[in-house]
């Protein structure tokens, strides 16, 4: 043992508080929202911290050393605690410095940050030819700028774009290779996850805290029973209520973006609101040529270009910011979203059908009669009818689109005033007699 005795160990007594003061005087460290943060970003694994504390203590503290290390870490959480540590959205912390949105770069790691990417900034990095060729083979040219902007969007802790992305194909195109490359770009700031799990598990959101990107590389085909958890992540702009199993809920920063690869659409079982679909950027892949021979090393080749991919993504981020966080969206992508929306809500096709109803400014029809006509249309077209309440809600939500007006002043066949719609006429007369009354 050396002759020097630290202030936190005097007369055989170990002072945890003084140890933490000494430790923080030589280490940039803070604790917020249940995690330690350093100039390298969030501390994902606390073991290196515990090992360093152990090495500092082992010469002076003998018995119960492991337990005392745990106690020190707990005291350190209190000593390094800050009330709030909000995300900073005008810069990207990288392996060799900080890149600001205006293009300026500052070398070094002078400050504690929430997220730091494991990629160096090199303004002279070569163009990522394998990456660009891969995207050209996978996607239609007009959709590549959307991917560029979305990946760039994920570089900063912001949800201003309020969009998630779904890349859809038939299988075998290689779209999930994008996730492999993004894992190299984002490192521990990206997580593999499941959109389905997020939608049904109230604890899943907390697992995405401090994360820039969540990738679902094989999205489940089942329609989501509830969409509020997914929508809250996509649109979060500030702190939200998070909950971990067995613990009290708390307010935490949420800025994880969602990216899914799938062979089908992201559908909702009950949510037919425009908002659920409006939040999706839906891109479709090209058909895989029968003569194409896949390169088994393509993921590694693209990952080796990560510094060039960073510059490419940063260009997309700058364009997105310049456009007020409005994504470039091709007519194909817009049509994809409309088709998905229609596929989940056949009320649109019913309203545009012939022989069942007619849009007519001076006509009016009760909600009940319209719903019976709609059920007839569904039965004759081998489609499943949604519930009456959902049908009326869909009409109300789209009444401006079809020049309808919801009212409670429609006179039905019995002479009673009931709810209905002005601007639509039923061309068929379904039997409104309750089935229990029929002979």
How would you describe each model-predicted region?
Residues 212-215, 258, 262:
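Conserved two-lobed SF2 helicase motor
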Residues 204-250:
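Conserved nucleotide-sensing/catalytic segment adjacent to the nucleotide-binding pocket
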Residues 66, 70, 88, 186-188, ...:
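Positively charged interface segments
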Residues 24-42, 47-49, 92-212, 281-284, ...:
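P-loop NTPase catalytic core of nucleic-acid-dependent motor ATPases
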Residues 7-9, 59-63, 138-143, 266-270, ...:
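Short, polar/flexible loop-turn hinges at active-site or ligand-entry regions and domain interfaces
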Residues 303-345:
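Phosphate-handling catalytic cores of nucleic-acid transaction enzymes
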Residues 52, 56, 178-181, 211, ...:
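Alpha-helical scaffold elements adjacent to nucleotide-binding pockets in ATP/GTP-utilizing enzyme cores
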Residues 1-129, 137, 240, 266-267, ...:
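N-terminal nucleic-acid engagement/recognition segments and initiation subdomains in replication
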């Amino acid at each position: 043992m050396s002759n020097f005795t630290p202030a936190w160990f005097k007369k055989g007594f170990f002072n945890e508080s003084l140890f933490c003061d000494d430790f923080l005087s030589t280490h940039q460290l803070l604790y917020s929202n249940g995690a330690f943060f350093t100039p390298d970003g969030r501390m994902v694994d606390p073991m290196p911290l515990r090992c360093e504390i152990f090495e500092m203590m082992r010469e002076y503290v003998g018995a119960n050393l492991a337990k005392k290390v745990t106690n020190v870490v707990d005291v350190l959480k209190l000593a390094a605690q800050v009330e709030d540590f909000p995300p900073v959205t005008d810069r990207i912390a990288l392996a060799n410095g900080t890149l600001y949105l205006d293009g300026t770069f500052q070398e070094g790691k002078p400050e504690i940050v929430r997220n730091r990417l494991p990629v160096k900034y090199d303004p002279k990095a070569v163009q990522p030819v394998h990456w660009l060729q891969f995207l050209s083979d996978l996607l239609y040219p007009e959709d590549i700028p959307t991917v560029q902007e979305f990946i760039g969007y994920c570089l900063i802790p912001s949800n201003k774009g309020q969009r998630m992305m779904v890349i859809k194909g038939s299988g075998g195109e290689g779209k999930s290779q994008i996730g492999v490359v993004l894992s190299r770009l984002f490192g521990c700031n990206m997580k593999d996850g499941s959109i389905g799990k997020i939608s049904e598990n109230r604890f899943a959101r907390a697992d995405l805290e401090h994360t820039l990107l969540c990738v679902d590389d094989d999205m489940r085909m089942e329609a989501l029973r509830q969409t509020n958890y997914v929508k809250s992540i996509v649109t979060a702009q500030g702190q939200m209520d998070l909950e971990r199993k067995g613990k009290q809920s708390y307010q935490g920063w949420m800025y994880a973006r969602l990216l899914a690869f799938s062979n089908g659409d992201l559908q909702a079982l009950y949510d037919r609101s425009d908002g659920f679909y409006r939040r999706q950027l839906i891109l479709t892949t090209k058909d895989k040529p029968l003569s194409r021979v896949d390169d088994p090393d393509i993921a590694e080749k693209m990952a080796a270009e990560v510094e060039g991919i960073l510059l490419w993504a940063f260009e997309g981020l700058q364009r997105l910011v310049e456009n007020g966080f409005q994504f470039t969206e091709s007519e194909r992508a817009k049509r994809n979203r409309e088709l998905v929306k229609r596929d989940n809500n056949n009320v649109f096709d019913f309203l545009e059908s012939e022989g069942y109803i007619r849009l007519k400014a001076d006509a009016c029809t009760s909600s009940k009669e319209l719903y019976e006509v709609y059920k007839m249309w569904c039965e004759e077209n081998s489609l499943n009818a949604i519930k009456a309440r959902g049908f009326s809600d869909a009409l109300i939500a789209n009444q401006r689109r079809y020049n309808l007006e919801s009212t409670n002043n429609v006179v039905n066949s019995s002479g009673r005033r009931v709810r209905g719609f002005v601007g639509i006429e039923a061309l068929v007369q379904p039997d409104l007699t309750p089935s229990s009354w029929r002979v």
